[in-house]
Amino acid sequence: MIGKLKGTIDEIGEDYVLVDVHGVCYVAHCSARTLSKLGSAGEACVLFIETYVREDQLKLFGFMTALEREWFNLLQSVQGVGAKVALAVLSTLTPSELANAIALQDRAAVSRAPGVGPKVAMRLVTELKNRAPAFAGEAINIALKQELGEGVAAAPVADAVSALTNLGYSRDQAANAVAAAMKTAGDGADSAKLIRLGLKELAR
C-alpha cells in the first residue's frame, strides 16, 4: 500500500494531481481544497495517500494532512457516502468546520457539499456525532494554529479552552470563542482575559 507520496507536480487536473516520483508518475485524486493548496507544475509536493484496490483498478486519493485522510475514511463509514461524496464534503468544509457542523448537528452546512442531499446530511451528522470527537479536537488545534500562529497551543489558550468546556460548551465552541478572543486581546493575554472575552463571544 502507498501511504505517502513525495515528488514534484507534473500536472494538476480538475480533480487530480499527477505526481512525479523519480520518473514514475502517480495520479492522486484530491479534494478541491487540497488542489488549491498545491503549487504549480515542477514544484515539490507531499501528499498523504489512501490507496483503494479493486478487482479492476487501483486508485489513489491524496490529502495535505493525515487528519484530512482520516476524515475521508470516517465519512465513508456512513451509509450512502463513497469516495466521491467524501471528497466533495472535504472540498466544501475544512476538518475543523466539519467537526463543528457535526457537533452542532448542522445539516445545512454539510449539505452545501455537491452530491449531499438532506438525507445523507442527516445521516452524516447523526451517525458521526459520537464517533468524531477525537478528530474534532485535533482539527480544532490545527485550525487555531493556522489562524493564530504556532504558539496558540501554549498554556493560556489551552487553559481558556478547557475552562469554557468545563462550563458546558463544546470543545469546538470553546476553541472558536478563544480564537476570537485572541484576535481581540493579542498574543500576550492571560487565560483569565481569554475566558472573559470568550464568554462574551459565546453570549452573542
Swiss-Prot record:
Superkingdom per UniProt: Bacteria
Question: GO terms for biological process?
Answer: DNA recombination; DNA repair
Q: What's a single GO MF annotation on this record? A: four-way junction helicase activity
- Identify the stretch(es) annotated as Domain I: 1-64
> Does DNA repair appear among the keywords?
yes
Keywords assigned: Cytoplasm, DNA damage, DNA recombination, DNA repair, DNA-binding
Region listing for Domain II, in residue ranges: 65-143
Matching entries from HAMAP family are given as: DNA_HJ_migration_RuvA
Name of the protein: Holliday junction branch migration complex subunit RuvA
Naturally occurring in which organism (per UniProt): Rhizobium etli (strain CIAT 652)
**Gene that specifies this protein:** ruvA
